[in-house]
Structure formats: structure tokens, C-alpha cells
């Protein structure tokens, strides 16, 4: 399992130290919020540029914004590995995905918990990652929504049919209690914020998620 600690849960007063504490992660997950699509504001390109100078871990950028193409053009020069946009609020998602891809970045598509998985069927050939929100977007520290496990299975079947190389990622409430179920549901990458950053040994917490084991009965 690949693991992406969410910087939304980090202490920004000590960001360099926080990033070093999760340096064994596969990605760093960056939530960009504009205060319109979701009721919260987070980091912009200046902070993200600083992050790239602090770490060699690939960046996984999640745009929770309106007018995603504007933000893609802001963040693409920083060379994140992934930029994901929401399917729900884009009039022309294929156009934005192509913009991301033309920048040499893996495009991703995001679904909120209650958005039907069939809505992305015709976009799957244009993406390298599908991100399923397992909480309502906007704030960290929320409880995992179990209904997303069934959705993972359905999306994985769509991926197998339309784009087998596409990764499946889940974001929200991920911890050591549900990681095995997520792996069984076909998830390739998990985003975890509060669980990792509230752990005494963050590197060990990441390793525990990476090396998934069936929980004892």
C-alpha cells in the first residue's frame, strides 16, 4: 500500500520538521482549498514551493476549488507528480485533465462520498488516479464513512474495464483499523492526516499502513 500523509494535519509553524518526520512516505498529499468549493482556505503556490525545497517526496495535489484550470496553471510549474480535480464542479473536466497531462503531470479525478461512481466512467481513460473521498471534503480529522468501501469495489471494477493502470486512492479517516479493509477493496494509495501526525512515531505509523496485515480476530 502506498501512503500519502496529508499536510493539512501538519503543524505549519514547524513545517520543515513535520515534513522530515514523514519522509518515508510515498507521496505528500496537499489539499488546496479556495473557500468557495469548500468552506475552508489552505495553502497556495508559495507554501507549496517551500515544501518542494524541504522534501524529495513526490507531491499529490488535491484541488478543492472552483475554476480548476486557473489553479492547475499556478501549481503545474512546481512539478507535483499528481494533480486531482473534482468531477462534481467541472463543466469541462476532460479539458482540465488534458491541461494537467500536457504539463507532464499525472491527472486525477475526485469523487465525493455521495457522488455516483458511474459519473466518471467516460473520464477513466484520461486519468492516472481516481481519488475517493471517505469524508466530506473541507476539513481534516473526520470519521471514515464505511459506505465508501462498497464504492471502492465498484470503482475498481470500472478501472479494470476502462484503464487497468489507473491507481485507486482513498482520502479521509484512514487509520490502522480500516487499512486492511481498504486493501481488500482494491485501494492502491491511502491519504492519512490525523492518524499519522498524531502518532508518537510517525514513520512507524506510515510503515504500518504500507505493510498491511490482517487484524487479529
From Swiss-Prot:
Known catalytic reactions: D-ribulose 5-phosphate = D-xylulose 5-phosphate
Report the domain of life of the source organism.
Answer: Bacteria
Q: Which residues bind a divalent metal cation?
A: 29, 31, 62, 171
Which residue spans adopt a coiled-coil conformation according to this UniProt entry? none
Catalytic residues as annotated in Swiss-Prot or TrEMBL: 31, 171
Q: Which family does it belong to?
A: Belongs to the ribulose-phosphate 3-epimerase family.
Name assigned to this protein: Ribulose-phosphate 3-epimerase
Q: Species name for this entry?
A: Helicobacter pylori (strain J99 / ATCC 700824)
